[in-house]
From Swiss-Prot:
Coiled coil: none
Pfam families, per the entry: AOX
Record's protein name: Ubiquinol oxidase 4, chloroplastic/chromoplastic
Keyword ATP-binding assigned: no
Similarity comment text for this entry: Belongs to the alternative oxidase family.
Any GO MF annotation of the entry: metal ion binding
Amino acids binding Fe cation 2: E175, E227, E296, H299
Membrane topology term: Multi-pass membrane protein
Cofactor (UniProt): Fe cation
Lineage: Eukaryota, Viridiplantae, Streptophyta, Embryophyta, Tracheophyta
GO biological process per UniProt: carotenoid biosynthetic process; plastid organization
Enzyme class, spelled out: oxidoreductase
C-alpha cells in the first residue's frame, strides 16, 4: 500500500508541472503566430487564426482530461497513510493538540511494550519455543478484542463496516495457526508457560477492549508495537539458527495451513497485497519461520493502516465490482462509523 501511495503522490507531483509546461508552450505558439499575421495576406491570416485556435483548444482539452484522470487515480488509490496537508491558521491549535495526544499515546504504548519485552527476555532467555508460544498466545488477543467492541457498536447501530470484521478475523485466524505451530514444536510443554500465557492474554484482552473503546488509534498502534516486536524476534532467530532450521522438518500443521488451508483467509489479513500473490512453499522448518516472520510484517502494515479511520479495506472487497455492490442493496450510511465511544455517543445523539 505504501508503494501504491508513493506512486500516486509521485504521479500527481510530476503531472502539474507537465500541465503548466503544455500551457506555456501553447501560449508561446499562440503569441508567435500573432506576430506572423502582420506579414501574411488576409485569407492566410484567417486560415492561420482558425488552425491556431483549434490547436490551442485541443491542447487545453488534453490538459483538462489529464487533470481529471490523475485526480480520480489519486482518489481511488488513497490508503489513508499519506502525510496530511499543512493545516491552516484557524485549525493550527487543534492540530497541535491532536499531535501532542498522538505522541502521548504512542509513548505509553512503547513503554508498555518494552516493559513486557524485558519480562519475556528475563523468563525465556534460553527457551525459544516457549517464548514463541507465549508471544503467539498474546498476539492473537487484540483481534478478537477489536471484533468484540465492533459487534457491540453494531448492536447500537454505531458501526456498519464489514471490512474491519473480516480483516480482524483473518488476522486472529493467522495468529491461531502460529500458536498451533508453536504447540506442535513443544512450546507449551511446561505448565508455568501455559499459566503465564493464559493470564497475560486475559488481562491483555480487557486492556485492549478498554483502549479500543477509548481510542481505536491507540489500540491499533499498541498492536502494531507488539507485531513489530514479533517480527524482530523471528528475524533474529532466523539469522541465528537458519542453517539448523533448514535441516529440520516442517510441522504438519504449518504445511497444511500455508499450502492447503483456507487461502481466502490467508489473503484477507494482508491488506497491502493483492489476493493470490503470496503462496508460500514449505520444505523445512526454516521456511515455516520465514513465513511466520513475513506474516508479522503484514500484520504491522494492516495495524498501521487501521490508525487512519475508515481507511481499511478487505483485499477481496477491493476486487469486487462497484456495480455488484450497488445491486446487493446493502447501503452503508455515511455516519455508521465512529472513532471511540465519545464519537459514537455524539453521533447517536445528533443523528
Amino acid at each position: 500500500m505504501a508503494a501504491i501511495s508513493g506512486i500516486s503522490s509521485g504521479t500527481l507531483t510530476i503531472s502539474r508541472p507537465l500541465v503548466t509546461l503544455r500551457r506555456s508552450r501553447a501560449a508561446v505558439s499562440y503569441s508567435s503566430s500573432h506576430r506572423l499575421l502582420h506579414h501574411l495576406p488576409l485569407s492566410s491570416r484567417r486560415l492561420l487564426l482558425r488552425n491556431n485556435h483549434r490547436v490551442q483548444a485541443t491542447i487545453l482539452q488534453d490538459d483538462e482530461e489529464k487533470v481529471v484522470v490523475e485526480e480520480s487515480f489519486k482518489a481511488e488509490t488513497s490508503t489513508g497513510t499519506e502525510p496530511l496537508e499543512e493545516p491552516n491558521m484557524s485549525s493550527s491549535s487543534t492540530s497541535a493538540f491532536e499531535t501532542w495526544i498522538i505522541k502521548l499515546e504512542q509513548g505509553v504504548n512503547v513503554f508498555l511494550t518494552d516493559s513486557v519485552i524485558k519480562i519475556l527476555d528475563t523468563l525465556y532467555r534460553d527457551r525459544t519455543y516457549a517464548r514463541f508460544f507465549v508471544l503467539e498466545t498474546i498476539a492473537r488477543v487484540p483481534y478478537f478484542a477489536f471484533m468484540s467492541v465492533l459487534h457491540m457498536y453494531e448492536t447500537f447501530g454505531w458501526w456498519r463496516r464489514a471490512d474491519y470484521l473480516k480483516v480482524h478475523f483473518a488476522e486472529s485466524w493467522n495468529e491461531m495457526h502460529h500458536l498451533l505451530i508453536m504447540e506442535e514444536l513443544g512450546g507449551n510443554s511446561w505448565w508455568f508457560d501455559r499459566f503465564l500465557a493464559q493470564h497475560i492474554a486475559t488481562f491483555y484482552y480487557f486492556m485492549t477492549v478498554f483502549l479500543y473503546i477509548l481510542s481505536p488509534r491507540m489500540a491499533y498502534h499498541f498492536s502494531e508495537c507488539v507485531e513489530s516486536h514479533a517480527y524482530e524476534t523471528y528475524d533474529k532467530f532466523l539469522k541465528a539458527s537458519g542453517e539448523e532450521l533448514k535441516n529440520m522438518p516442517a510441522p504438519d500443521i504449518a504445511v497444511k495451513y500455508y499450502t492447503g488451508g483456507d487461502l481466502y483467509l490467508f489473503d484477507e489479513f494482508q491488506t497491502s497485497r493483492t489476493p493470490n500473490t503470496r503462496r508460500p512453499v514449505i520444505e523445512n522448518l526454516y521456511d515455516v519461520f520465514v513465513n511466520i516472520r513475513d506474516d508479522e510484517a503484514e500484520h504491522c502494515k494492516t495495524m498501521r493502516a487501521c490508525q487512519t479511520l475508515g481507511s481499511l479495506r478487505s483485499p477481496h472487497s477491493i476486487l469486487e465490482d462497484d456495480d455488484t455492490e450497488e445491486e446487493s442493496g446493502c447501503v452503508v450510511p455515511e455516519e455508521a462509523h465512529c472513532e471511540g465511544i465519545v464519537d459514537c455517543l455524539k453521533k447517536s445523539i445528533t443523528s
